[in-house]
C-alpha cells in the first residue's frame, strides 16, 4: 500500500491495552485500536492515557491505526521538519 493512501488523523489515548495497543478516540468521536509505529517502539517513546497523538489509518479498515507522533503539551502541532542541525 502506498503512503498516499493513508488517512492521517488526530486523537487522544483513552485506554492502554496489553501488547502495546491503545484505544484512541479521534477528534470526531470515532474510537479505534492503535499500535505504536516502528520508530516510536525502537526509541521507547512512552504513551499514556490522555496523551494527544497523531495516527495513520488505512482507508480499507477504519477500526485500526498506527500511532506516528505523541504531542507534548506546550509544543507545536506536529513534528517539525526544519533542517537547522
UniProtKB/Swiss-Prot annotation:
SUPFAM superfamilies in alphabetical order: Nucleic acid-binding proteins
Residue intervals of the S1-like domain = 1-72
* InterPro entries on file: NA-bd_OB-fold, RNA-binding_domain_S1_IF1, TIF_IF1
Keyword list, A-Z: Cytoplasm, Initiation factor, Protein biosynthesis, RNA-binding, rRNA-binding
Supply the NCBIfam families for this chain: infA
Stated role: One of the essential components for the initiation of protein synthesis. Stabilizes the binding of IF-2 and IF-3 on the 30S subunit to which N-formylmethionyl-tRNA(fMet) subsequently binds. Helps modulate mRNA selection, yielding the 30S pre-initiation complex (PIC). Upon addition of the 50S ribosomal subunit IF-1, IF-2 and IF-3 are released leaving the mature 70S translation initiation complex.
**Listed name of the protein:** Translation initiation factor IF-1 2
Originating organism: Paracidovorax citrulli (strain AAC00-1) (Acidovorax citrulli)
Amino acid at each position: 500500500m502506498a503512503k498516499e493512501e493513508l488517512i492521517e488523523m488526530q486523537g487522544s489515548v483513552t485506554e492502554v491495552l496489553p501488547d502495546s495497543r491503545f484505544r484512541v478516540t479521534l477528534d470526531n468521536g470515532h474510537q479505534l485500536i492503535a499500535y505504536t509505529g516502528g520508530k516510536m517502539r525502537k526509541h521507547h517513546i512512552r504513551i499514556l492515557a490522555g496523551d494527544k497523538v497523531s495516527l495513520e489509518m488505512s482507508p480499507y479498515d477504519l477500526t485500526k491505526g498506527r500511532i506516528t507522533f505523541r504531542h507534548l503539551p506546550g509544543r507545536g502541532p506536529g513534528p517539525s521538519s526544519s533542517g537547522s542541525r
